[in-house]
């Protein structure tokens, strides 16, 4: 490939240049199909353990039989030392390309031949063998149903999500309705903000919540969504002005910060105990 590229720089004949370019592209296609590293060293083994409360996940570089032995050892240890029973139904051995559920996420390893140019313009397979965190669609659906913000109807054999008014909020002030929706949207987004598909699914979550909020306020004021949006719209935002208990004029703005994916904070010192020592006042 390098020889052909060098020859291409000095070649002036149009037909020869075209043939050289076709050959170079062919070499690039072959290179993109070849693994850049050894896929599996048969003698290499590794185990990674992650726990939160009573949920844990173990990643193993090894065979299925070895994973079975590890599971059996953990089951015996928990029974003998901790006096706990390991649920056989929930404790599964999952191949890396399949989806494993952990703390509300689905975790998998991407198998992709897709390419992307790096900052130097070099075409690379950046997505293959990467661990991916996914927000499950069912989690979004169930959360919206739990909030009573959505109803599901069947259209031509497919699910259709429709926002609806939250009737139990009819006694709340409009600004309090907006505040409640904002709190729920931020809470859901912040928890799943490191998921690879958070932008797509949280946009849908946000849309349903937004129109549920419109419908809730419209129902409270015996109005329509169109009239409510027109009444409270201000510079592309939904803003409710109100007077607080102290007589001060304030505004409540509906969530408008988007659903961009955030980077995981791998260096967060969440396990370090706080220093509670203090010096007495002199």
What positions do the PLM features span?
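Non-catalytic terminal/accessory segments
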Residues: 1-282
